[in-house]
């Protein structure tokens, strides 16, 4: 972006200067509104989410047999919700900032099949596509036992079709493993920052991996192009997909059930704050949408991004959304948080969700490494760097009097609050790689 344009952008949005300087930045959204007001802008409804629930239930008998690790939950892919009191104390000590309320961790990092939040959206979209093809071919009815999809006849049928996706890693892992298991031919277009072990794991499942020297945006674009030339190839579009988004949104009702099981209350007197790592936006956007439908105006969602890849904060704050990239303002989009290394936000999620998100913040790679080490020491839980992005959120919220006043929170409401950090990945990171991460923390 030329200097004059840049200067005028900074004059209009002074916060951009801090982003350019790679400062850890917090922006509380002044335009946040009620669910009733914000919902029409999403373009999806509670019914759409219920349809996604129903589809995942239909596929549960299939998943329970296709993936032994889901048998115990009857083919439902869901993660644990755990309290992390020792980590809460450690954060308070390190940052000299009390966290009012209780700190919890949602362990999507340990979801079965692919060990990340992408096991929600990625697997869901592959299943939705497989169901559509099988229904159209008359091989399946909605009342069937879907475990019949494991038969050689279905494998043969699906092998005529292929799936393509562009990814920095975890989405590719989810879509690749699921597509290959069903019988699709599958190609994952991987950006330069994708971890070698993720590529190796995909290849071990018979997935074709195409590697690029460039970033996420290029991998997605090339994947899209390659798919266009083949009528039997379905491209899963991480930047725009409503189906992926709905796969993630199912998490809202599931979390509500987990809260009920644990006797946790969310209402006006007991607010819930949720901190979601954000790359292109589909995962956190879908989860936040589901949470809003489940908990209404009593849940407050925040997106967390690396200082080197603040695409969603930049897009929503300036109102330019996908019309601006971090590279346009001189930021390199290079971060250890490979799942969040996205320079240009989704053209769908920011516009759909901007009225329903309470805020956005950035944190440095070093902060992620530090917290990764503390969590391993204090709670014995090991995550990949990007999964720690949410962990910086509770301090930002508890330290901001202006945010608390904006929403009229009393000291008592904050004492009764639940802070939920969404851990997005790391359950499948190889030991030696994890040791390298741990060595980088202070």
Swiss-Prot record:
Where is the PTM N6-(pyridoxal phosphate)lysine found along the chain?
118
**What chemistry does it catalyse, as a reaction equation?**
D-serine = pyruvate + NH4(+)
Q: Which InterPro entries match?
A: D_Ser_am_lyase (IPR011780), Ser/Thr_Dehydratase (IPR050147), Ser/Thr_deHydtase_PyrdxlP-BS (IPR000634), TrpB-like_PALP (IPR001926), TrpB-like_PALP_sf (IPR036052)
Report any one BP term from Gene Ontology.
isoleucine biosynthetic process
Give any Pfam family that matches: PALP
A GO term for molecular function: pyridoxal phosphate binding
Signal peptide region = none
Cofactor(s) listed in the protein's UniProt record: pyridoxal 5'-phosphate
Instruction: Give UniProt keywords alphabetically.
Output: Lyase, Pyridoxal phosphate
EC numbers, comma separated: 4.3.1.18
The family database entries (NCBIfam families) matched by this protein are listed as: D_Ser_am_lyase, PRK02991.1
Q: Which HAMAP family match?
A: D_Ser_dehydrat
Q: How does it assemble?
A: Monomer.
Family, similarity comment:
Belongs to the serine/threonine dehydratase family. DsdA subfamily.
Protein name according to UniProt: D-serine dehydratase
